[in-house]
Amino acid sequence: MALPLFQYGSAEAGKFFTIEKESEAAKLFGLDRVGPIRFALQGGAKEVLAYTVSSDVEAESFEEIREAFESRSFNVFVFPEEISAEERANTKAWVVRNRQEGKHFLAVFGGSNADDQDPAIGNERTTQLADDYIVNLITGAHVNGSPYSSGKYAPYIAGLIAGTGINKSITYAPVQATDVGKRLKNSEIAAALQKGSLLLVHDGEKVKVEQGLVTSKKKIRAIRARQAISTDIPRTAAEAYIGKLDNSADGQAALISAVKAYLERLELNHVLTDIVVTLDPERKSEGDSVYLLIGFTETDSMERIFLTVRV
């Protein structure tokens, strides 16, 4: 997962660092500056791709961040804290543009402590950020007696998403927190879910994710499966087939077979089912271009159980 740093001690500015342990981050940036990285690793991220932002001018710094991460690979992006509405909009546009250009990742956002006290404000932020590739956390958390806004706790959620397999859901996943910033009523929880917000709840024993949703109201699990497929198939084709096979019936059949084999491996891991891979009948495959029609159904997780009790 990817994370820009605005505070990083004596570390070199304008540089990428790959962090796998909190101790590495503390040595590089100072113990009092590793909070966002600590949250990401505690959430489950195997490693954090951190970038030390060199500009101290807001507009320039965010442009620098987008430009720097443009050439790097990652599956989830998050800021270390809440950002302005303008930069949220700019980042959303960046996520959308990257998707259109073939680079697929989720972005996680949050808000301020003040915003977290009114779920309607968080839900409005969700509406503004509505997209298949964006997650908006609207509740903060208390950790070891200290309160954190949803913006500052967002790196934990980003780490949780990044570290969860694409065949698993983060719904009801417990998080490392002692309480939520504000406990919402059932009606507020229902309203937030209908908007596509991601929220934390305290169930009386622990703090957990209520439901793993992106801001378009779809499930994170399904979107991450699509992202993996959209990333892996072009990469596999480029590495093993492009420039190595003739664009003939035999070459096309070999490519189709390879794509099917990849999807079937995902099917065995309960990621998807109902696989279809054929040549696209609406676009002619000729010259150096092959157009495939790929269809599948994401495997859903059991997230809600309805019981009827007769007495």
Task: Name each model feature, range by range.
Residues 1-311:
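Surface-exposed assembly/interface segments
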